[in-house]
Amino acid sequence: GGYEIYTTLNFKLQAAAQKKVRENVPTRSTILNIGSVATSVEVGTGRILTMAQNRPFNDSQTPKQGQTAVNYATDRDYGGSSGFQVGSTYKIFALVEWLKQGRGLNEVVDASRFELNQAAFLDTCDDGGGPWGGPWKFKNSGGAGGAAMSVFNATVNSVNSAYASIAEQLDQCQIRAAAESLGVHRADGDPLETNPSAVLGTNNIAPLTMAAAFAGIANGGVFCEPIAVDRIVDRDGVELDGQTQDCRRAMTAEVAAAAAAPMAAVITGGTATASNIGDGVPIIGKTGSTDSFNQTWMVGSTRKVATAVWVGNVKGQVSMLNYPGGSGIRHIIFRGIMAEANRQYGGGGFPAPPSSLLAGSGVKLPADVIGMTQEQAKALLEGLGLRFEVGGQVDSALEAGRVAGMSFSAGTLLARGTTVKVTISRGNLVELPNVVGQLYDDAVTALNAAGFTNISESCAEIPLDGDPGQDGIVTAQNPAGGAKVKYERSITLTVSRVVCS
C-alpha cells in the first residue's frame, strides 16, 4: 500500500471531454440502450489523455440505473465491452494497404457495382474465416457513388461501392495486417475478421484502439501503444518508472502522408465537415456508421492529439436516426474535445503526399480503344493490366462489331485490375447531310439519295418586310446536319414560304 500512481490523463481536457459527453448523451433513454465514449491519446507517445463516457462507472453489487461496470473505451480484458462495429472508419486500413502496395490516390476504381462475388476476394489468412464465396450485396449512404471514382474521392465521401472495388484488388489478409500494424485488434480478443465486408467495418473494436491507430498515421506512420501511467511513487517517496513508451513504425512516412491527404479532406469537405473546428489547426479524420446506423463514430487527429468518439447501442440494433440529433452527436462531442485539445497542444500541418503515391501504378485508358474490334480491345486492355468485359450493343455510326464506347472516359487513370466495359456498335447510324439553304425539293432529293425517306415539312411564313426570294428555301432542319441517325429517323425541314397554307 501507500503507492501514489500518476496517470497520463490531462484533467483539464478530461473535464472538457466528460462535459461534452454528458451534455449530449444521457445515462439512459427510452428510445434505445444508448452509450457513448470519447477517448484521446497523445500523438507520438501513446499517453491516454481522456476517457469519458455517458454512464458513471460503478462495479458494486448495487449499481444505480444509468451506471455501469463496463468501460466502453477499452478491450474486454481491461474491464471493457466487446467493442463496437467501427463502420467506415475501418476503410482507412484498406487505404493504407493500397498505398503500401504502391497504388495511387488518383487511381480510379469502379463504384457502380452493388453486388460482388466474394470468391473474387483474395484472402491468404488461415484464421480469417475464408475462403469466401457467394454474393455480397451492399449499398452506399445517401446515394453516393458512380461509374468511376478516384480513391481520394472515395475516401472523402466514404463510398462503399468504391471501397469494395479497392478491397477486391487487395489481399484481405494484408488489409488486416495494415490494421494490426497500427495496433488494431478486436476488443473480444478474437482475430480480426477478413471477410470482404470487413473493409466496411464489421469488426468490433474498442474506441481507445481506434484513437491510437489514427494517432499512428498522424505521427508519420509511427504507432505508439496506449499507456495510462506516467510514474509511481512508493510509500518512502521513491519514484518508480511508469509504463514505458512502446512505439514502432507501421508504415513509411510517405504512405502516412498520402493516407492523411484524403483524411484531411474528409474534415474540410467530406463526410466529417460537422467535426471541422475551423480554428486553423489541421485535422485528419474519418466517420463511421453501421448499415442500420445503430453505431456511429468520429475518429480524428491533429499532429498532437487523436480522439475517437463513439455514440450508439450498448445492446440492441435501434437506429441512431430514431434518436433526436442522433447522427450528429458524435460531431458535437468531437468538436468540443478537439477545440480544447487544440488550445492546449496546438498542431502543425501534415506533409504533402509524394507524387509517386498520387498516380501510383495506375494506367491511363487509351482513346484508341474506340473503333477497335473486340479482340483488339481485349488484347490492349488486358495487356495494360485491366479487365475486359462486353457490356452490350449500341446504335453507332462505326462499323458493326467495333467498340463504340467504354465505361470510363479516355485518359482516366484507372487502377490496375479495374474492369472496363465496352459497348459494341450495331453499325446502324449514318451521318445526316446538311441541307439548310437548299430549295425544299433539292433538299428532299439529297436526303433521299443518302437513304433518308421519312421527311416532313414545317412552314415558316416570310414576314411582310421579309425577302420573298427566300420562298421555298430550307432554313432549319431537325436533326441538324452532321448528326448520326438511323435511316428511318423522322426528319423535319423548316421551309420559308410567302404564304403557309
Residue spans of the language-model regions?
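Short, charged, amphipathic alpha-helices and their helix-cap/turn boundaries
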Residues: 170-187
